[in-house]
Regions:
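Extended, highly charged
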Residues: 1-257
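Single conserved hydrophobic/aromatic residue that forms the stacking wall/gate
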Residues: 255-265
Length: 265
């Protein structure tokens, strides 16, 4: 946001704006006209109250903003870096060792860095999703949706996964996530246990792009985020779940999933 502000690419709206339809309509208009990102400083919730948390939309709504968010100067830069890591030109690096410094930097940035406390743990909010400025964008939508949720789970062996699944608010404490139950959820179901889930909002751009990237099995989303950001990704232990979550996420919602065989449990 500070970067966008400095480049006059952040529109601040300081009057109340409804999170139901109004905020989405404004953002939609800006997207279609190559407009700036928009920060709603007084998002109005469904009950008519003003949220204490602002709502940012259209942060990646232009080609140029997306490149700058990833620290890239052109579309193939990140792909070129990945190819260099997977298929290094050993002959070149032996002749010109300094050419291998970017590769070394990316390799050192891969392992995530464990820290004691995250930004999203400084304040603990009541268990009420309706107090968050989660938009309802279209008249035919089934409800209010978190559209860029960073969903953290782990498999039966403790390997973490970061994914993005549109999350629908059902009530004050329940979210609906669209995912494949035969993966991590199935691992936990086979053990007769519910799966811990963290739904994180915000954080550095590399987290968002890592969560939506198709990655090989031997490269985790946290490692890829480190490569994208060119620095180790800080992660921290979730407060009430046995999960490592992004330490720089602004909000972290902690859940357990229902049984895939019986959603009422």
């Amino acid at each position: 946001m500070n970067h966008l502000d400095q480049r006059d690419e952040l529109l601040r709206i300081d009057r109340p704006v409804d999170v139901e339809y109004e905020a989405g309509a404004i953002a939609d208009l800006l997207v279609k006209n190559d407009g700036p990102a928009v920060l709603f400083e007084q998002p109005r919730l469904a009950d008519g109250t003003i949220s204490s948390i602002p709502l940012l939309m259209n942060a990646f709504g232009s080609h140029d903003r997306t490149l700058r968010a990833l620290g890239a100067s052109h579309e193939t830069e990140i792909g070129d870096r990945m190819v260099a890591m997977m298929k290094p030109d050993i002959g070149l690096y032996m002749r010109k060792p300094w050419k291998g410094l970017p590769l070394l930097r990316d390799a050192l940035a891969m392992p995530p860095k464990k820290v004691r406390k995250g930004k999203g743990q400084r304040v603990r909010l009541p268990n009420d999703l309706t107090k968050l400025p989660i938009p309802k964008t279209w008249p035919m939508d089934g409800g209010h949706f978190i559209t860029l949720p960073l969903v953290v789970t782990k498999d039966g062996d403790g390997e973490h996964n970061l994914g993005m699944y549109r999350a629908q608010v059902h009530n004050e404490t329940e979210l609906g996530l669209h995912w494949q139950i035969h993966k991590h959820a199935a691992d936990h179901a086979a053990k007769g246990e519910r799966m811990p889930v963290a739904v994180c909002i915000g954080g550095p751009p590399e987290l968002i792009f890592s969560a939506i990237s198709p990655l090989p099995d031997n490269l985790s989303e946290y490692q890829f985020a480190g490569i994208l950001g060119q620095k180790s990704l800080p992660i921290t232990k979730a407060l009430t779940q046995d999960l490592w979550v992004p330490a720089e996420a602004d909000i972290c919602l902690l859940y357990t999933s229902p049984s895939p065989r019986d959603p009422t449990k």
